[in-house]
């Protein structure tokens, strides 16, 4: 009996989420426009406001699966640009996108990414990474901050002066401390909450110029 009650509660919660997801304007638009996820519109809006990703650039997309940011960035850099995507999860192939499956913290994966960069320089690092949330900020926030720190470390190791990091953060404990630390290495940090971010979401995107 207890199990059935628990399942009913989960079913109600799942049904509510599914209804919101189906009714979501950006979900419907993504399906119409051929993007793999509604997150595509977040990067599109960010780039409309910053114009950081341009034709011919080299961009690395961290935590790229399922690939909507890679779709957008690939379109923005064009045929003469390079888009390298990496994730520990598999990702279906995309035209003109080099996907490297693995943990970019591991030397062999990092070296593989940089080998694809070749003699070019990395112009922009993207990170839409987020942990599997538990619904408990005491657990979720430290996990998110760790991913942010990994993205910052990668950006510092690969970006030249003037290069940019576009990174998702969850507003909460640790964000101000991280921002202060980043100010020592980045000349400018800007915050943007795109229209495609759900209003109740704590997510924010930082645009940091090295």
From Swiss-Prot:
Catalytic activity of the protein: uridine(2552) in 23S rRNA + S-adenosyl-L-methionine = 2'-O-methyluridine(2552) in 23S rRNA + S-adenosyl-L-homocysteine + H(+)
Pfam family, one: FtsJ
Positions with a binding annotation for S-adenosyl-L-methionine: 67, 69, 87, 103, 128
Lineage top rank: taxon: Bacteria
Positions of the catalytic residues: 168
MF annotations from Gene Ontology: rRNA (uridine-2'-O-)-methyltransferase activity
EC number: 2.1.1.166
Entry keyword set: Cytoplasm, Methyltransferase, rRNA processing, S-adenosyl-L-methionine, Transferase
Xref: InterPro entries: RNA_methyltr_RlmE (IPR050082), RNA_MeTrfase_FtsJ_dom (IPR002877), rRNA-MeTfrase_E (IPR015507), SAM-dependent_MTases_sf (IPR029063)
Any single Gene Ontology cellular-component annotation: cytoplasm
Catalytic EC class: transferase
Location in the cell: Cytoplasm
Protein family (similarity comment): Belongs to the class I-like SAM-binding methyltransferase superfamily. RNA methyltransferase RlmE family.
HAMAP family assigned to the protein according to its UniProt record, in alphabetical order: RNA_methyltr_E
Free-text function comment from the UniProt entry: Specifically methylates the uridine in position 2552 of 23S rRNA at the 2'-O position of the ribose in the fully assembled 50S ribosomal subunit.
Entry-linked PANTHER family: RIBOSOMAL RNA METHYLTRANSFERASE, RRNA METHYLTRANSFERASE 2, MITOCHONDRIAL
Name assigned to this protein: Ribosomal RNA large subunit methyltransferase E
Species per Swiss-Prot/TrEMBL record: Psychrobacter arcticus (strain DSM 17307 / VKM B-2377 / 273-4)
The organism's taxonomic lineage, starting at the top: Bacteria, Pseudomonadati, Pseudomonadota, Gammaproteobacteria, Moraxellales
